[in-house]
Amino acid sequence: PHGNGKKIKVAVVTNEEIESYYNVNIDKFTLNETLLKYRYLKVPSDNININRIRRYIQRLSNDDRDFLDSLNFQFAELKVNDSVWFAERDVISSIEFINQTNKSNFMRVNRLYEIKDDQYINYFIVKDLLKSGNIPPLSYLYDRIKLNIINQRKINLIQNINKEILNDALKSSKYEIYK
């Protein structure tokens, strides 16, 4: 810190600041990729609870979530946190039966897809979808906005320190001009 006793606020960013930044700059945010919220479950095909699991993954009330969590050890994969937005490319890379060629077959909202192979049954359901060109939700941009605010503060801090150094040098006549 500079020797003048000023406190410097750089890293603490409040939710209000992030929301304000988002609202002020909302016209600058445009998705360049599709985002989705989804549920995914991969379960051995011989699981005795398969009918309940199918029903629960589709509706997913709190009780259903508790039931699925209690069976978690039986699943090869479980992703039921459908309140988080994911980039379509990340979903495609993490779910083996979805690829660039067939992705449009699996992107209808609230439709349960059941994909079977020799060992497993895969359940996949898109709960929400935002196509590229739309404005992304704040929750998706939150960390990026926070980082932007911190970086802007750092730039302002450096500029202010440089000004203070220059002003101090001018006041005390302790400077040299280089040509």
Give the positions of each predicted feature:
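Peptidyl-prolyl cis-trans isomerase
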Residues: 1-179
